[in-house]
Structure formats: structure tokens, C-alpha cells
Amino acid sequence: MIGYLRGKIIEVMNDSALIDVSGVGYEIHASSNTLGDLQALLGNDIIVWIHTHVREDALQLFGFHDKEEKNLFLSLLKVNGVGPKMALSILSGGRPAQIHEMIEAGNAKALSGLPKVGKKTAEQIILTLKGKLVSIEEGGVVAKAKSVAHTQITSALLNLGYKSQLVDQFVSSLPADIAVEDGIRKGFQTLSGGLS
């Protein structure tokens, strides 16, 4: 799993960017906000936070200019009916702090004004995430009371293709001090048959 890439921005396209890391070009999909930030830094060395999305027929890299956007993206993936492409579209509609504020305020009207978000999706986002995100401060948007191990286990199981709801239920049942390897191993045993 790739956590971040450090390299030079070679090209910025409509919905993706090309980053040269030690002679290898990685294409990352990103929100229009991140792409705008990267365009301004074209030719410079940068760090881009990465979410690796694995499907049966593809491996895609989603990039974020900061951790706040990445964490909000991962939270949006927990919403039923929101996949990576829709989550990027939502993030293209505003900065993480603005979207977070809409969710916490229960403002379905404002959320439904974001790209590709209808009334039902906006309501589902609020139902799933309201009260489960802490305020955006120096550390960004993070899930409440989640240990580092739980976060890593969740990320690993989602990257392996397990369904978000099953992963969340499973991880919430684990002790906070569990070793990451043990959690992933138990996840394989418990969630077999739960691939998307």
C-alpha cells in the first residue's frame, strides 16, 4: 500500500496528474482543488498523500495535497453509494473544512449543490458521517476515537476490496491495542466472502 509519493509534477490533466518518482511516472486521480494546487507547483518536487484503490480489474491511485482532504475522502467512502470517483467529485465542490461544516450542520441543501450529489445522497452522507468527524484543526479531519492500529487495519482491508460497512463493523469490535498484523489476519478470517 502506498501512503504518499514524493516526486516532481510532470503534467496536470483534467482529472489526474503525472508525478515522476525516481524515474517512474505515477498517474494519480485527484479533486479539482488538488489538481489546481499541483498545477501551481508544476515542475517542482512535492509530496502527495495517496489512497490506493484496488478492484478486480484495476489498481488506481487517488492523490491529495493534504491529509485533511485524504481523511475526508476516506470518510466519504464509508457512505453507502459513494465510491472513489463520486468522493473526488464531492471534494471538488469545496475545501474539506467547508464540506465538513455542511455535514455537521446537517445542511442537505448545501451538500446537494456539490457535484454529483443529489438530495438522497446528501441525506445519506449526513446520516452516516454527522457527529463522527471531529472539527478541523491543525490535525485535520479524523474519525473520533480510532486508534492508529484501527485506522491501518481499516485501510488495509478496504484496499484489499472488502466492503466498507463490513470492515467498519469488524474493526469497531477489535480492542484498541491490537497489533495491525493480527487485526488484518482476523479480518481475512472474519470477512472472507465480503469482497465488493
UniProtKB/Swiss-Prot annotation:
Region Domain II: start-end pairs: 66-140
Ranges where the record places region Flexible linker: 140-144
Signal peptide start and end residues: none
Domain of life the protein comes from: Bacteria
Family annotation (CDD domains): UBA_RuvA_C
Keywords: Cytoplasm, DNA damage, DNA recombination, DNA repair, DNA-binding
InterPro entries: DNA_helicase_Holl-junc_RuvA_I (IPR013849), Hlx-hairpin-Hlx_DNA-bd_motif (IPR003583), NA-bd_OB-fold (IPR012340), RuvA (IPR000085), RuvA_2-like (IPR010994), RuvA_C (IPR011114)
BP terms from Gene Ontology: DNA recombination; DNA repair
A Gene Ontology term for the protein's cellular component: Holliday junction helicase complex
Molecular function GO labels: ATP binding; four-way junction DNA binding; four-way junction helicase activity
Major localization listed first in the record, in broad terms: cytoplasm
Compartments where located: Cytoplasm
Region called Domain III, residue ranges: 145-196
Stretches for region Domain I: 1-65
Record's subunit section: Homotetramer. Forms an RuvA(8)-RuvB(12)-Holliday junction (HJ) complex. HJ DNA is sandwiched between 2 RuvA tetramers; dsDNA enters through RuvA and exits via RuvB. An RuvB hexamer assembles on each DNA strand where it exits the tetramer. Each RuvB hexamer is contacted by two RuvA subunits (via domain III) on 2 adjacent RuvB subunits; this complex drives branch migration. In the full resolvosome a probable DNA-RuvA(4)-RuvB(12)-RuvC(2) complex forms which resolves the HJ.
Family, as annotated: Belongs to the RuvA family.
Function in brief: The RuvA-RuvB-RuvC complex processes Holliday junction (HJ) DNA during genetic recombination and DNA repair, while the RuvA-RuvB complex plays an important role in the rescue of blocked DNA replication forks via replication fork reversal (RFR). RuvA specifically binds to HJ cruciform DNA, conferring on it an open structure. The RuvB hexamer acts as an ATP-dependent pump, pulling dsDNA into and through the RuvAB complex. HJ branch migration allows RuvC to scan DNA until it finds its consensus sequence, where it cleaves and resolves the cruciform DNA.
Official protein name in the record: Holliday junction branch migration complex subunit RuvA
Taxonomic source organism: Bdellovibrio bacteriovorus (strain ATCC 15356 / DSM 50701 / NCIMB 9529 / HD100)
Gene: ruvA
